[in-house]
From Swiss-Prot:
Compartment(s) of residence: Secreted
EC number: 3.1.1.3
GO MF annotations, alphabetized: triacylglycerol lipase activity
Disulfide linkage: 89-123
Protein family per UniProt: Belongs to the type-B carboxylesterase/lipase family.
Name of the protein this chain belongs to: Probable secreted lipase ARB_02369
Enzyme class: hydrolase
Glycosylation sites: 377
Length: 564
């Protein structure tokens, strides 16, 4: 049996954690202060950067506001000390069985795990970090970060924009970094017919949207330009970025102006999903209701709002999570609600109902390895078919799923971690399952989305990449979540330097090439030959985006039956 700590260390690689680093000494000068309409916000300074962490952007979603859309702040909060550790929203703590310790043992003594602390329902806050020299007249571009964590974990506690801001300052193309806290798990993405009827679905997405509206109202006071916002996310955060493009049928405006002008998606894009009141959603809802002791209540949803915090937390966490055998067949995720998310994201994309903004989107080479470690009883092709039929795609027949599985050779040398021959075969179908999960949720879904985007909006620039710099890591390869450490500058090297430079160019100019220092290859638009920028360990190169073409074709032609 795995301990909770071991599971947490694993999920640290899944992108909810960044390394712990020694905090820089606070500069001895007057604390930076920003006057908002509803509060005086006091921050801290270090390394020429002012940080304001834990600024409330919504009323606390507690009591009668639990499981309700976020509400703007209406009163005066007085002085807000935005200098400590922001409270995390309630987390979905998971258990995972049967993963050999030696796979992740090397991570235990490295600084890849930082425990999320101080969690609670009063968690809707936002972080702002800016160059100390920025004034309301600076009009700096803004990078708006949405964390990942499978819609179950994550917090702004774990992400710091210092490395990105320092690089931007050194290159005289300053940016402001913003990170938003949003509700996760059953607090933010509870499905069910009662939830839909109440208008309380996809609360985590609505939290993010209110955070963007807060930026539109307030970021100028910190030196930012509300008309130059790029939204960026990883994993569930990247899926959220896509959903922010798709909310309200692609209307991303607030008071007549766009909330963002560009988008960056690391390891995530479109996730076809059944409605919030689908049978699977009802099963999740009824399980939570039962565990909370609300099954006999006249109004079950009202009962869920009235139980104490610990009771609801335990009930919300009683369903399968991402580290369980179910893997990425998530209990909690954005689902069509007929209101904010009017249809499955894939259908909105095909209908052209998306915010039309330039974007960067990419993946790690081995996205599926971390999600395939526990299914060691899957040893045959039929086992694979049964697994996807039982846990994932209830709208597909076994014959259709067998056809999908057959597009992946029953040959370890063709599986993930890719390009490793017959090595790293943890159990008989491990590399095949890892290849499929990585493609279905991330890599080939990205390609299908890009095909749609470029057919619907050929004038909109799109850029795509593949990270392969962790190729030598046994069992995992360049796994899901490894890009977080690279993007935030915690693993110095050519990949980190490259990604930060290209992203800073995009945030400033909506073009990853404009302003990027000499020596970096030109990143072509994806429409120009369907080429990926390949971030390798010691160099960058271009790679044709045509691998696993038969599988990609099947996915594109059968998206309607491959809903989670």
């Amino acid at each position: 049996m795995w301990s909770l700590l071991t599971a947490a260390v694993l999920f640290a690689r899944l992108s909810i954690a960044v390394p712990t680093t020694a905090a820089p000494a606070i500069e001895k000068r007057a604390a930076p202060t920003v006057q908002l309409d509803y509060a005086t916000v006091v921050g801290s300074s270090a390394l020429g950067i002012d940080s304001f962490k834990g600024i409330p952007y919504a009323q606390p979603p507690v009591g009668k506001l639990r499981l309700k859309p976020p509400q703007p702040i209406t009163g005066d909060l007085g002085t807000v000390q935005a200098t400590g550790l922001p409270r995390a929203c309630p987390q979905m703590y998971l258990k995972s069985d049967d993963i050999p310790d030696d796979i992740l043992g090397r991570f235990i003594n490295t600084p890849v795990f930082q425990k999320i602390t101080h969690a609670g329902e009063d968690c809707l806050t936002i972080n702002v970090q800016k160059p100390s020299s920025a004034t309301p007249e600076s009009k700096l571009p803004v990078l708006f970060w949405i964390f990942g964590g499978g819609f179950e974990f994550g917090s702004t506690q774990l992400y710091d924009g210092t490395s990105l801001i320092l690089r931007s300052m050194a290159q005289n193309r300053d940016i402001i970094f913003v990170a938003v806290n949003y509700r996760v798990g059953g607090f933010g993405f509870l499905p069910g017919a009662d939830i839909k009827k109440d208008g309380s679905a996809n609360l985590g997405l609505l939290d993010q949207r209110l955070g963007l509206q807060w930026v539109a109202e307030n970021i100028e006071k910190f030196g930012g330009d509300p008309e130059k916002v790029t939204i960026w996310g990883e994993s569930a955060g990247a899926i959220s970025v896509f959903d922010q493009m798709a909310l309200y049928d692609g209307d991303n405006t607030y008071k007549g102006k766009p909330l963002f002008r560009g988008a960056i998606m690391n390891s995530g894009s479109v996730i076809p999903a059944d409605p919030v009141d689908c049978p699977k959603g009802e099963v999740v809802y009824e399980k939570v209701v039962e565990e909370a002791g609300c099954s006999k209540a006249t109004d079950k949803l009202d009962c869920l709002r009235s139980v104490d915090y610990t009771t609801f937390l335990n009930a919300a966490n009683s369903v399968p999570g991402i580290l369980s055998y179910n893997s990425v067949a998530l209990s909690y995720l954005p689902r069509p609600d007929g209101k904010a998310l009017t249809a499955s994201p894939d259908k909105l994309g095909r209908s052209g109902l998306l915010a039309k903004v330039p974007l960067i989107i990419g993946d790690q080479e081995d996205e599926g390895t971390l999600f395939s470690l526990v299914q060691n009883n899957i040893t045959t092709t039929e086992h694979l078919v049964d697994y996807f039929s039982t846990y994932f795609f209830h709208g597909a027949t076994k014959e259709q799923l067998r056809a999908l599985v057959d597009t992946y050779p029953n040959d370890p040398s063709a599986g993930s971690p890719f390009r490793t021959g017959n090595l790293n075969q943890l159990y008989p179908q491990y590399k095949r399952l890892a290849a499929m999960l990585g493609d279905l949720v991330f890599t080939l879904s990205r390609r299908v989305f890009l095909d749609i985007a470029n057919s619907k909006f050929p004038e909109i620039p799109t850029y795509s990449y593949l990270g392969t710099y962790g190729h030598i890591i046994p069992i995992l390869g360049t796994s899901h979540g490894s890009d977080v450490l690279t993007s935030f500058g915690y693993t110095p090297g050519i990949p980190s330097t490259s990604i930060q430079n290209y992203y800073l160019s995009f945030v400033n100019n909506l073009d990853p090439n404009k302003g990027t220092p000499l020596g970096f290859p030109k990143w072509p638009r994806w429409s120009e030959g369907k080429m990926l920028l390949n971030f390798e360990a010691v160099k960058n190169s271009l790679l044709k985006d045509d691998f696993r073409g038969e599988s990609a074709k099947y996915l594109e032609e059968h998206t309607d039956i491959l809903h989670i």
